[in-house]
């Protein structure tokens, strides 16, 4: 499953949460067609924009029992958790609830 917000998502998320929203070099103007790349490598691929489309693709992918990729288009401002702070170890990963508790 690809959470595709058409930017370098985790880098932008770091810039948003830890660097005062000072965005630099994160917007991807030339988009990768993840469906074509996946199909070129022999996987079944889906492109989805809604939760309903995702649920249908996910169910089919599980039933097929072959390599599948689901390219989920999400809003540029959506956050993805869990995540790791810059310079932190994977054992220090945190989720949205941890972030909210720090505020």
Write out the residue ranges for each language-model feature:
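Thiamine diphosphate
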Residues: 1-103
């Amino acid at each position: 499953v690809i959470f595709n917000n058409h930017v370098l998502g985790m880098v932008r998320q770091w810039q948003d949460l830890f660097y005062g929203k000072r965005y630099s070099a994160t917007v991807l103007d030339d988009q990768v067609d993840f469906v074509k790349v996946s199909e070129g490598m022999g996987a079944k691929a889906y492109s989805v924009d809604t939760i309903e489309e995702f649920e249908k693709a996910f169910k089919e992918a599980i039933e097929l029992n072959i390599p599948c990729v689901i390219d989920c288009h999400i809003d540029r401002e959506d956050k993805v958790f869990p995540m790791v702070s810059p310079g932190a170890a994977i054992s220090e990963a945190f989720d949205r609830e941890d972030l909210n508790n720090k505020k």
